[in-house]
């Protein structure tokens, strides 16, 4: 049995090197909306270490919540901390990750990213076999180096034909 009362994924938290630059990227390039800011947060005791697993002298300059259409919210953190690593993990590293955005028109979305100077990794790949047949995907890199992805499967994926559970699907129209 899983978490009692689980309703879904609420948000994804990301630490960025420059909150304002990351916000411009998420708002102007991706299309998210700023909802609210909080912070700064600093503690003279071990609260940061106990509650967030970071150096106890860490300072969160600001935390910003973004809404991205009808998916989970994005929580951006900007820390001021002495032991911060400037390079995130690769996808192949333990803890590696990427953030994926569903788009209705893959070609238009890729052209939009490239038009904003975003590094797109290769060309979109359409899966033609297996349970994920029907998905079109491509990775891209945020200005601070984080790997992100575009996906599109307007006709669904092959696994859905006989599945007891269907993965997240975009709403007919996102706001």
Residue ranges and their predicted role:
Residues 8, 59-60, 93-95, 134:
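Exposed loop/turn and edge beta-strand positions of beta-sandwich/beta-sheet ligand-binding modules
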